[in-house]
Amino acid sequence: MINCLIVDDDKKLLQYVSSHLERESIQTHTFTSGEASLDFLENKNVDIAIVDIMMSGMDGFELCQTLKDDYHIPVIMLTARDALSDKERAFLSGTDDYVTKPFEVKELLFRIKAVLRRYQINADNELQLGNLILNQSYMEITVGSKTMNLPNKEFQLLFLLASNPKHIFTRDDIIEKIWGFDYEGDDRTVDVHIKRLRQRLSKLKSSVSIQTVRGQGYRVDQNV
């Protein structure tokens, strides 16, 4: 089931949009302020967010940028503001789509599904574990707004571990999968790569860490 965050200070609109989306089997979580929605996201995950611009406190532009930078959530702006300058600012903030009020709920539904399809295509080359996102296309890792490119072997090693959380890989397992059967170098090269990855993850303040299981090998854990 799709989980949708809706943030708008108009309670009637929240109820209207929520009721229609729920009929389409989309679970909704509604909030009248950006601050409240971010509190919710501390413990819950959503697939997409619908955000108004004009709200007291944190406005929609600021909320959109936070959702994109810190949570990597697709965003649709739903607002009465139709000036080109507002649209420009919204897209610069990271929004994936922009819908002006008044609107047809069916059109909003079409746009939700279209945005999610685009994200699914992008997600095919990405893996997320905790707050760490690994992008295979660019061999880069991202935590929040910080991105770091990794050398090929380091990325492959981290991707292998992150794809199998809690699974313990021996040095031989890792060498076979990353360097290949015909590798003739020192198996301590694995330790060197692990050390570098730990330094990089620490620098990014990732919730993911690489643990040594004494006498067995390595695995990834998420720090709480």
From Swiss-Prot:
Residues 124-222 bind DNA. The keyword S-adenosyl-L-methionine does not apply. Keywords: Activator, Cytoplasm, DNA-binding, Phosphoprotein, Transcription, Transcription regulation, Two-component regulatory system, Virulence. GO terms for biological process: regulation of DNA-templated transcription. PROSITE patterns: OMPR_PHOB, RESPONSE_REGULATORY. GO terms for cellular component: cytosol; protein-DNA complex. Its main location: cytoplasm. InterPro entries: CheY-like_superfamily (IPR011006), OmpR/PhoB-type_DNA-bd (IPR001867), Sig_transdc_resp-reg_receiver (IPR001789), WalR-like (IPR039420), WH-like_DNA-bd_sf (IPR036388). Pfam families: Response_reg, Trans_reg_C. Residues 3-116 form the Response regulatory domain. One of its GO terms (molecular function) is transcription cis-regulatory region binding. The modification 4-aspartylphosphate is found at residue 52. Phosphorylated by HssS. The keyword DNA-binding applies. PANTHER family: HEME RESPONSE REGULATOR HSSR (PTHR48111:SF49), REGULATOR OF RPOS (PTHR48111). Member of the two-component regulatory system HssS/HssR involved in intracellular heme homeostasis and tempering of staphylococcal virulence. Phosphorylated HssR binds to a direct repeat sequence within hrtAB promoter and activates the expression of hrtAB, an efflux pump, in response to extracellular heme, hemin, hemoglobin or blood. This is Heme response regulator HssR. It comes from Staphylococcus epidermidis (strain ATCC 35984 / DSM 28319 / BCRC 17069 / CCUG 31568 / BM 3577 / RP62A).
